[in-house]
Amino acid sequence: MVQGSPFVVVANRLPVDEVTDDTPSSRTSGGRRWRPSPGGLVTALHPVLAEHKGTWIGWSGTPGPAPDPFEVDGIKLVPMSLSEDEVERYYEGQSNATIWPLYHDNVEPPIFRRRWRDTYREVNRRYAAAAAKVAAPGATVWVQDYQLQLVPAMLREQRPDLLIGFFLHIPFPPIELFMQLPQRAEVLRGLLGADLVGFQQRLGAQNFLRLSKHLLGTPYSGSTLEYEGRKVKAEAFPISIDFAEMQRLADNPLVRERAKQIRAELGDPKTVILGVDRLDYTKGIEHRLKAFRELLADGKLSVPESVMVQVATPSRERVEHYQALRVKVEREVGRINGDFGKVGVPAVHYLHQSYSRSELAALYCAADVMMVTPLRDGMNLVAKEYVAARAENGGALVLSEFAGAAGELRQAFLCNPHDLDGVKDALMRAVTVDEGEARRRMSIMQRHLRKHDVAAWASEFLDSLAEIGGTEKNRL
């Protein structure tokens, strides 16, 4: 087992995916091949982990016994085992059928099961034990997201010497919603085991502070509360993307050529409207489809001049809510294409599959309008990726007010996804915006994201955590 790491990341998943082919970029361990996962979190933390001989603890993604610890690109990886039952109860159940919908404003009713809670607790205990075992004395441990909310307190009980941070990537709900959680006090105490609890938005931090006072009587002042003789800070750290990497990808001649090819395959329409989402009920896919259908029915948009491309990446396919959502979305797509499509020219090109980073960049480059209309979202990095990919090409972003990104991307065409007329109005303003105005808006958003990228996010969080620990950042 890995020992003595000064910096430990604890997340549901490892930052690698197992591969079955001979991918050149993959690494071999114990007869199994791995490649780094795409994603901003991995990109942001890789330099810190590599520099400080850090360790990442997480599940490999495959049920069954865990592989032995191994190393990829200078980062020590400690795989966690999850049985089929644990995947069903801890991950698909408590994490994604209970906590996920509850934290997203009950967009779908959460399901409460005692056996799910018990398994969630046991899995969190194993993650905490693994972190306690590998962390060096006085190490910094950064716990990630809603699947592991009990870990900070469990870890502090075993290793009070550690500096513990926690970051929640999804929204944190108001008191009246959180109080529905049968495990509410246990989850709150779990989070209070951290020295710093980070949220995507200031409202999430405020909800957390108010909840702590309401449920546990914990006094707070500003962003700091006192709990069991310790000070715990709750602050907002809006996550971002690797802006430079997405811009480089979008500037690649092969990606540019692919973008032209995509437009040609779509019939060279005047306006390409794009949606890229996990197939999730929080993303508002149905709402944007209905808005598009009504604009076609009103005659404000027409096929083939305007077409929509909706990428709906498969997600949590064994969870009942997600199965039902797929049926609804595909029924709506069929209705639109039946009513407004033409021979060889569907109104909506619906793609229920995953895409590579380069193909997504090509889609961003090909799209005149990007629609990001979640009913509730912690941040939404797709909106930021679209902005980064546009370079000097203008384009327009239609963005839900309920995405965390709306707090930063104020030059987007903001809308309330529950207000269908408002969504239609925002889409039409985006479609008809003057080219110069589109470039101006996009330029302002790009300047912001260039400065506030994912590396800045990680640095800001770790700086704040180190300050709480009474040390400089080089504590790591």
For each of these PLM feature ranges, what is it?
Residues 1-476:
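Catalytic cores of carbohydrate-active enzymes across secretory and cytosolic contexts
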